[in-house]
Amino acid sequence: MSKRENIKTTIEEIVAYWSEHEDESGLSVDFSEAHERCWRCGYKRKLERCHIVPASRGGEVKPSNFVLLCKKCHKENPNITDSKIMWDWLRAYAVPFYNTFRINMGIIEYEKIYGITVQEECAKRKINDYEELRSIMKEKTKELSYHFGEGCFNSSTIAGWIRITLEEYDKRHNLKTDKNIEPLVSRKRVI
């Protein structure tokens, strides 16, 4: 098996190409910062040149066949020969504000695990004072940890952080935290 050639296409060439050929509306990044922020999560990270059409499937080494992703997002990107799928994926995960992607993924993960949205959890408790929740979340941060080699909390850690925050809120207000956990595949709205 031959070793793949080093990619000669630069980050600047990729940004220049896509800033003229793709609308940044609905993406997690503005093209003015696309050279330093991941195009999926929007965080400032070391960027990797990610093939749109995989090299293993004949993807070319030219600006039109690359997007810029952080290592974590690069591992999760679609590896398929239809280039539209990459742009569908990027737009589906777009967030309107920088540095909110991971918390949003944690909120989605929370619903998957507990079968209820965070918004519904707050409404059920009639929470109007979010400062108290923020304060509890800050206290609970000491109970969290990154996986070795990762620089951020994963979505299940964030979902757990939300859960222990709500449990503490319930404890302080003499409320009972629901413990109904069903397998995701048995819920009606899945598949």
Spans of features found by a protein language model:
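Short, charged surface segments at domain edges that flank catalytic/cofactor-binding sites
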Residues: M1-R37, G59
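Short cysteine-rich clusters marking metal-coordination/redox-active sites
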Residues: C38-C41, C70
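Cys/His-rich microdomains that often coordinate metals
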Residues: G42-K46, N77
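Histidine-centered catalytic micro-motifs used for acid/base chemistry in nuclease
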Residues: E48-I52
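Short cysteine/histidine-rich metal-coordination sites, predominantly Zn2+-binding motifs
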Residues: V53-V61, K84-A94
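Short beta-strand-alpha-helix junction that forms the catalytic/metal-binding core
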Residues: G59-N77
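PEST-like low-complexity intrinsically disordered regions enriched in Ser/Thr/Pro and acidic residues
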Residues: A94-I127
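C-terminal, charged low-complexity interaction regions
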Residues: S135-I191
